[in-house]
Amino acid sequence: MNKLVLGNLLHRPLRTLISIAAVGIEVVMILSIVAIMIGQVTNASRQTGGIGGDIIVRPPNASFISSVGGAPVPAKIAEVLRKLPHITVAAPTITDFNMTGGVETIWGIDFDSYNALRPFVFLAGGPFTGPHDVMVDDLYARSAPKGPGHERAVGSTIQILGHPFRISGIVEHGKGGRVFLPIHTLGALMGSPDNASLFYIKSDDLKNQELIRQEILATPGLSLYQVQTIQEWMSLMTPEHLPGFNIALRAVIGIAMIVGFLVIFQSTYTAVLERTREIGILKSMGASKAYIVNVVLRETAIVTIAGIVAGIFFTEVMRIILGYRFPTLPFPITADWRIRGAVIALVGSTLGAVYPAWKAARKDPIDALAYD
């Protein structure tokens, strides 16, 4: 039977290759979209975990997505927080979107307090020396467009929110953001020079986090503020808690599965029509319906497995290329999603082959032999 299956596939090599390519594209589509979407979530969680704070304090009704909400509260609240027991550092921070040259989040920080949470690791240069200085991380520096005038080295000038800034230092990635401005400068650009978006707190002991929460909420004017530990915040940064995330993910996977289904259905159905006489010969020689179905499904399985392998391979190639060309783009491909992608492709292909296999098994041997 295996020789028969391979012979059928090799008899129409172009169609077989197209079917393999279609399944491969389905797998690439699933894995790449999942990698980009989930990569953004996991990267945001990892970056926040690297800031060094233990607690996040946000204004009432603020989104848990830190870059949404502007700078609605006075940065001087940090002075009030620093006076509370068990708080060693209170760092006011602003986060804002920059749409110049792509979507990125700009962080406005008070360098001394933010650095006290966990010190920056400078790979080149140093802290701000003026209001028009900017610090960037190493991945942002590496992702500079090619060509003169686009360099991102210490001393270079980059545009942020339509204004020129000099790069004073390049830091190791993993400290919340990729681009850091003085908090007063970013606030002024947003029209709120003395405000902040949120506050990162460092406690004297992790065991005192609940006490700190109670102290903050008991402070006049802060009773409605949101106080979360970093662990609590990170537990919210999952696909289940992001509006529309899982819906978009399922939609992409559904479209990819439909593509695989239609290609395998069309390919298998055409193959069955072309081999009507061969099917008639097999049935006249005593081949059962189950045997015919088995042959068709085995052909589909071989094509699908080859497509899955090709899809995973080219996704890895894409990951390497994107990692080199776009260092700031997280593109994790987990073993879990490799397996899921393979199962989705296999299910879609099998469903696409069921009707052609059933149709082939039902052919009357006499009619099939008379088919021209």
Predicted regions and their residues:
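Peri-transmembrane interface segments
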Residues: 44-47, 64, 171, 215-262, ...
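The feature marks short, hydrophobic/small-residue-biased sequence motifs that occur predominantly
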Residues: 73-85, 92-133, 161, 180-183
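C-terminal membrane-exit region of the final transmembrane helix in multipass inner-membrane proteins
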Residues: 333-372
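Transmembrane alpha-helical interface segments in multi-pass membrane proteins
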Residues: 269, 277-323, 340, 344, ...
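Hydrophobic, regular-secondary-structure patches
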Residues: 28-105, 211-220, 225-226
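Mid-to-C-terminal secondary-structure elements
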Residues: 113-121, 138-192, 211-218
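Hydrophobic alpha-helical transmembrane segments of multi-pass inner-membrane transport and secretion
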Residues: 13-40, 242-281, 301-310, 351
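Short helix-to-coil transition segments within interhelical loops
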Residues: 9, 281-290, 363, 372
